[in-house]
Amino acid sequence: MSLWLGAPVPDIPPDSAVELWKPGAQDASSQAQGGSSCILREEARMPHSAGGTAGVGLEAAEPTALLTRAEPPSEPTEIRPQKRKKGPAPKMLGNELCSVCGDKASGFHYNVLSCEGCKGFFRRSVIKGAHYICHSGGHCPMDTYMRRKCQECRLRKCRQAGMREECVLSEEQIRLKKLKRQEEEQAHATSLPPRASSPPQILPQLSPEQLGMIEKLVAAQQQCNRRSFSDRLRVTPWPMAPDPHSREARQQRFAHFTELAIVSVQEIVDFAKQLPGFLQLSREDQIALLKTSAIEVMLLETSRRYNPGSESITFLKDFSYNREDFAKAGLQVEFINPIFEFSRAMNELQLNDAEFALLIAISIFSADRPNVQDQLQVERLQHTYVEALHAYVSIHHPHDRLMFPRMLMKLVSLRTLSSVHSEQVFALRLQDKKLPPLLSEIWDVHE
């Protein structure tokens, strides 16, 4: 029997998460879920449709109104020139010259006929509040050559020609103006009645099977978290010795972290046993999947406990760990920094319990793990969870089309972190830090 599927943990009673594979463990877990609250009832009432996403087709051309022939006027009509609207003049099409330097003008800029060069120069000068100094007394003749030599005279000529500083918009004003225009266009688009030729929009939806699966995952995760929390309270306490650099303090910190890791592994095994389809796999494939995915799931769970304000991670109530604490426990900076960077990136996504549970399930059901025999079945199971996550994200993030691919890319980042973790384990061996038997078997550390 594999050691890590039933290894006892010091100071943790037999009825805790250590008894990972007793026959009655699964039934007890199922009964515990019966009274869990459903957080997804609202989606269940959403209208169903046969497809997932609507195909976009060509819209039919709108009917064109017939033009009636105009009757000839009985009296001659007086033709009056139209008055030009207020605002900047249209772009020049001839050979007009810049009023500042004499170069070819491109249009009216800031109320003056000017070239692109003088337009940009005036804008930069106003935004920066620049003050230039002329070394020739301030009387330089301005042309295409001198405009590069004397900035003070060029700016003075811009103002003399009539360029107005109040016409220059700052970057923030331009951004707000663009944003306002986009909002107006969007409001106008939503106010238009739908065209008869437009296909009806098919809303994303969760099937009853997907809804039930997500509810089960969330309930299982909450149950495992409650159980592991009580186990975490029994680990070796963090040392508060007067000499934090003493050998005893270092050993105590290392034991503290390794025991936390053991509890996390137990939580992962408990959760995996409640994943639909997991127990139908062979025992060998169950072990292969859990051994290689354990560190990735641990890092996902770690990211949930990340506090961006203090840049710390809370494993125990009212006790947070920063980068320095990880280093004091014997971990290398090359492993610590990626952990915190990954946790920060995950925190920015603001995932909820259902999204985390689905990501963990997708990570566990990876058919490319070493020693997996029935890869086809594992792929099918993973595809089920990927489809459920896609449907769930489409409902909860309808305006963020990149949310789903961003979440899957985090699983790619976890693979990189997993290889860094292997190097960390090797470094611990070089430091003569002996891992507990359970962790040694999971991470294939052979003494």
From Swiss-Prot:
GO MF term set: cholesterol binding; chromatin DNA binding; DNA binding; DNA-binding transcription activator activity, RNA polymerase II-specific; DNA-binding transcription factor activity, RNA polymerase II-specific; nuclear receptor activity; RNA polymerase II cis-regulatory region sequence-specific DNA binding; sterol response element binding
Chief site of localization: nucleus
Region of interest: Transactivation AF-2: 205-447
One cellular-component annotation, GO: receptor complex
DNA-binding region: 95-170
Subcellular location: Nucleus; Cytoplasm
Induction: By 9-cis retinoic acid (9CRA).
Record-linked InterPro entries: Liver_X_rcpt, NHR-like_dom_sf, Nucl_hrmn_rcpt_lig-bd, Nuclear_hormone_rcpt_NR1, Nuclear_hrmn_rcpt, Znf_hrmn_rcpt, Znf_NHR/GATA
Compositionally biased residues, Low complexity: 24-37
Record key words, sorted: Activator, Cytoplasm, DNA-binding, Metal-binding, Nucleus, Receptor, Transcription, Transcription regulation, Ubl conjugation, Zinc, Zinc-finger
Domain NR LBD: 209-447
Subunit structure and binding partners: Heterodimer of NR1H3 and RXR (retinoic acid receptor). Interacts with CCAR2 (via N-terminus) in a ligand-independent manner. Interacts with SIRT1 and this interaction is inhibited by CCAR2. Interacts with GPS2.
Record function comment: Nuclear receptor that exhibits a ligand-dependent transcriptional activation activity. Interaction with retinoic acid receptor (RXR) shifts RXR from its role as a silent DNA-binding partner to an active ligand-binding subunit in mediating retinoid responses through target genes defined by LXRES. LXRES are DR4-type response elements characterized by direct repeats of two similar hexanuclotide half-sites spaced by four nucleotides. Plays an important role in the regulation of cholesterol homeostasis, regulating cholesterol uptake through MYLIP-dependent ubiquitination of LDLR, VLDLR and LRP8.
Protein name: Oxysterols receptor LXR-alpha
